[in-house]
From Swiss-Prot:
It comes from the Bacteria. Mg(2+) binds at residues 81, 123-124, 491. Functions in the biosynthesis of branched-chain amino acids. Catalyzes the dehydration of (2R,3R)-2,3-dihydroxy-3-methylpentanoate (2,3-dihydroxy-3-methylvalerate) into 2-oxo-3-methylpentanoate (2-oxo-3-methylvalerate) and of (2R)-2,3-dihydroxy-3-methylbutanoate (2,3-dihydroxyisovalerate) into 2-oxo-3-methylbutanoate (2-oxoisovalerate), the penultimate precursor to L-isoleucine and L-valine, respectively. Homodimer. One of its GO terms (biological process) is isoleucine biosynthetic process. The gene is ilvD. Gene3D superfamilies: IlvD/EDD C-terminal domain-like. The active site is at 517 (proton acceptor). One of its GO terms (cellular component) is cytosol. This is Dihydroxy-acid dehydratase. SUPFAM superfamilies: IlvD/EDD N-terminal domain-like, LeuD/IlvD-like. It catalyses: (2R)-2,3-dihydroxy-3-methylbutanoate = 3-methyl-2-oxobutanoate + H2O; (2R,3R)-2,3-dihydroxy-3-methylpentanoate = (S)-3-methyl-2-oxopentanoate + H2O. It comes from Shewanella loihica (strain ATCC BAA-1088 / PV-4). [2Fe-2S] cluster binds at residues 122, 195.
Amino acid sequence: MAKLRSATSTQGRNMAGARALWRATGVKDSDFGKPIVAIANSFTQFVPGHVHLKDMGSLVAGAIEEAGGIAKEFNTIAVDDGIAMGHGGMLYSLPSRELIADSVEYMVNAHCADALVCISNCDKITPGMLMAALRLNIPVVFVSGGPMEAGKTKLSDKLIKLDLVDAMVAAADDRVSDEDSEKIERSACPTCGSCSGMFTANSMNCLTEALGLSLPGNGSLLATHSDRRELFLEAGRRVMALANRYYRDDDESALPRNIASFKAFENAMALDIAMGGSSNTVLHLLAAAQEAKVDFTMADIDRLSRQVPHLCKVAPSTPKYHMEDVHRAGGVMGILGELDRAGLLHTDVSHVAGENLKAVLVQYDLVQTQDEAVQQFYAAGPAGIPTTKAFSQSCRWPSLDVDRQEGCIRTREFAFSQEGGLAVLSGNIAADGCIVKTAGVDEANHTFVGHARVYESQDDAVAGILGGEVVAGDVVVIRYEGPKGGPGMQEMLYPTSYLKSKGLGTSCALITDGRFSGGTSGLSIGHVSPEAAAGGTIALVETGDRIEIDIPARSITLAVSDEVLETRRQAMQARGKQAWKPVNRERSVSLALKAYAMLATSADKGAVRDVSKLED
């Protein structure tokens, strides 16, 4: 029998002081010896995806205590990438992932918790908690706050569906009237929850289902729907079942590293490719794999991207479908079911919702389930009423979307495309690879040749786009925005949105060592590695250089000879301490961000810390 970690602080005469303090938190004599389950909540009033989470910890705690455990809740920070977008606040977004991971580790280890429930939702919170859970390797269940309902409004007497990106594009488009822009803004984010498309937050919450660490519906069931209450209660029950399996029965298969195995990471990446998920998921899966001690790399992602078809197309890649539509079609389990039937899924992997993924699919794959309760579960739909309250409505779709030929989720035969929604490109400008969300790229732009227009920062690029410097045929190059060079690897949603608003969304490309919001579409290539600040070739590009992009061939090439590049590299090195740094960029960087930059690796490593610098 594995010893409870909490026994360190609850057992023995020498722990009298610790027990006295535990009693002061409400622990009774009869509780000592029970598993202590930490609840990492990320409630904050700053973020719509988290504003409704305040009472969720109490729901989970009640279920834990009914199942025989002690529940103790704490909070983490949560940055809203949308609110932080377009100014210096975005420098803090990716670094907050490491801070969240560390804070969960600190709390769990400092108090010797035996198990963990992670209540997350938005962009960096789920990845940070995932990294911590795999680092700690104690029984864990994830439960997110759920997606926002899609916005809806009437323009020219036509009802349209909206999300955050639509508001940003409309605001920058001179052809949109002030009245229509305001209508779109007021309708884009109608409820609490993570933004309604297949952006980073929803992508990551879906991926926890595929990794085996969250319950079916976690990524797709609306935040406002009353059915979601049961997910929180069941998370508390499940984590206690996992804790008992490990501590009482010596069953190590209950530990997250044995659930999130290499096969599970392949499943998660296959899901991401099939649903056209955010390119940020690549960054976060690579980081999580390192915490799990799983050798999952960009090479594996490249291999999968060539095998997995695009089975589910969701905003921002199409205005037709949002997360509420994915749920109606069977959610993550519906997509995984189609991957299974295509022979592209490992179903023998463990899962917190059942004996293994195969058993979970039998019950929750909408195509094969005979369970009427599950069918009712996927009928949970939007109410269309603005609210910040969780569980505030119980509306049901009048019918389910089981059309696998023309519906939201397709079979392999009727896939949106036979190659998936993400691709890894490489070439002399990105020797260690870069990422493009092909789900959002027009097929006509799968090959593109243009001339570089180079900017040393996102701010300069935005000014150039809005000021008319960028013209059709340009390849906008934004560098020194990587994990180290930014620092913090800013998202480039404003530059891509402004290209759209200027009518350049399909006639220009954008490449960067920064990253993109899950809301980005168009020929937007990010995560260029090595980044400029790490000596990457992207630092040597000059305005006017020819750049060739070939997605089918998975290549991206700076059409400059090796001899010329070597001359430029030597000139860069001659700058001494100013080498591999932006020229004339004015940016205030705090000590906290400088500390982050000192250890940050490039995107192909997940932008995790370079641990070699910490070794003796």
